[in-house]
Amino acid sequence: MHYDPIKRQAGRIFRSKGGRVVFFRLLNLLLLRSWYIRKEIRKWARFATPDASVLDAGSGFGQYVHYVSKLSGNFTVKGIDVKEEEIEICNRFFRSDGHGSKIVFEKADLTTFVEPDAYDLILCVDVLEHIQEDVLVMENLQKSLKKGGCLIISTPSDKGGSDVHKNGDTSFIEEHVRDGYAVEEIEQKLGRAGFRRIESLYSYGKPGQLSWKLSMKYPVKMLNLGKVFFLVLPLYYLVIFPVAMLLNSRDLYKKHSSGTGLIVKAVK
C-alpha cells in the first residue's frame, strides 16, 4: 500500500492558512502517535528554558512544529524534510501565521544533516523506519543536540508494526525499509550513537491498534481504490470519530506490555 501519494493529496487539499490549522487539529486527533508525542513534548516543556531550540527531523506537514510554537512563542523551531513541496507549503503557512524568523523549514537529508550542539529537543516521528542508514541518522541527531538535550522518537515496533504480524506478511506502508524495531535493537543502536540515557515504551496496544484500523488503515485502503472515496470520508468519520477518540484515550493512559508502536526518549 503506497501511503505517500495519499499524504500528498491530503496536504494539497489543506493548503490554505485556515485549512492547514484544521488539518493539524484533525491529525492530532486521529493519529494516536500524535497523542503520545504531544504528551512527551509537554513533559519536556515543563523544564525547558524560555529560549529553547527545537528540531523536527522529518517534519512532514509541520503539525509538531505548530504544536511546539503554541507552547511558547520564544522557542526557536526548525523543521527539516526531504520533500521540497512540503517545505515550501510549511514556510508559507508559518510566515502568514506571524512567526517570523522563530520558525523555519529547510530541505535536508538526515543522513548528512548535522548542526553541532544546536538543539535542546529533537523530534523524529515515524522517520527511522524509512531510512536504511538509521544508526548514521541517530549519530547525526546526537551531535546536533546540546549536552542534556532530548531526542523523542516514534516508530513501529517488531510486535506488529507496519501491520506485519507473522512471516509472509508485507508492510501496510510500502515506503518502509524495515517493518519495526525491537526495544533492544533500537536502544542498542542509540547507545552506539552516543546517547547515555534511553527509555522506551510501547504504544498502540490493543485499543490503539483497533483505532488505527478504523481511523487510518481502512480509509487509506479506500482512497487507494480511487479519489471518489474522498467524498465518502466525511460520512465515514462522522460515525468512526467518537469511537476512535475513546480508543486513543484508553491507549494513551494504559501501560502496554506489547504494542505495534514504540515511543523512545534518549538523552545526550
Enumerate the predicted regions with their spans.
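A short glycine-rich, Lys/Arg-flanked "PGG" loop and its adjoining helix->strand segment in the class I
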Residues: 136-147
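A short His-aromatic
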Residues: 126-130
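A SAM-dependent methyltransferase catalytic signature shared across enzymes that methylate proteins
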Residues: 187-201, 242
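Conserved catalytic loop of SAM-dependent methyltransferase domains
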Residues: 199-236, 261
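Short, glycine-/aromatic-enriched active-site segment of Class I SAM-dependent methyltransferases
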Residues: 154-179, 188
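A transmembrane-helix-recognition feature enriched in membrane-embedded lipid enzymes
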Residues: 226-253
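Conserved N-terminal segment of class I S-adenosyl-L-methionine
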Residues: 1-117, 121, 125, 135-138, ...
